[in-house]
Amino acid sequence: MIPAIIPYYKNKSQLARCISYLEGQTVPVEIFVRDNDRDNVYYTAAVNEGIKKYLDQPYKYILILNQDMYLERTAVERMAAFMDSHPDCGIGAPLQLHSGNPDYVIFAGGCEAFPLGRHQHGPLQEFTEDKEILWANGACMILRREMIREIGVLDENYVLIGSDSDYCFAARSRGWQVWRIAGARGIHECGASGKLCEPNVELLKIKDMIYFGQKWLTGELYQELSHKGAELTPEWVSQVMNDLQKAQAELEQMCENVVTAGR
């Protein structure tokens, strides 16, 4: 049995489809849905609520996935088998396939994580091998419970984005590996945790990225762990942080204007 945690928000058809695919897996899956319609704690806190539910139970692995992630029927079994045969792997990720073209991979491993995430992508035939990667996309990742007990849960200073890459960097800094598992696949519709391009949602994303920069980009560790870390000069980091803070101020003003107009 492998528990699966789904942060849910405002799309019943996506959730029903996601659950249907989990129920059709070749290994048993226990499903925990954190209903953010009821009270929206956003992605990171929702995931942590599920992790804490299962952390003291005798499961080897915990699966995290978005409501718009639809796993092939052998995906969970393949991920668990890979983790069994790679004891140093703390986090595993399947190939995420384009919802309109399942022969195209939209996530095969993280590249840059800051200021916005960029992923390895391309035709499916280019990603036939398992590979150690820098970070996994939080739309679907399997976590080793032993690792969670060592490094803790996700950092809730992130609200909507960034906690997945942050968690992978934290794991790798403690000696754990992150892998893409090529034999495990799923369709990803994209955008379930933060699809609306509203000022308040965009503001949350900006704040998450500012926090990521403040946490990781002030020392040499991130350069060692990140994609093309040597190119992250202090001047570049300073410029990007200034741009993010400017964008934050503009979005805060937009949000204030919306509130004022609604009074």
Protein language model regions, located:
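Glycine-rich, basic loop-to-helix element that forms the pyrophosphate-binding segment
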Residues: R38-Y54
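A conserved hydrophobic helix/loop-capping motif in glycosyltransferases and polysaccharide synthases
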Residues: I2-N11, C18, Q25
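Short beta-strand-to-loop acidic/aromatic patch adjacent to the donor-nucleotide binding site
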Residues: Y59-Y70
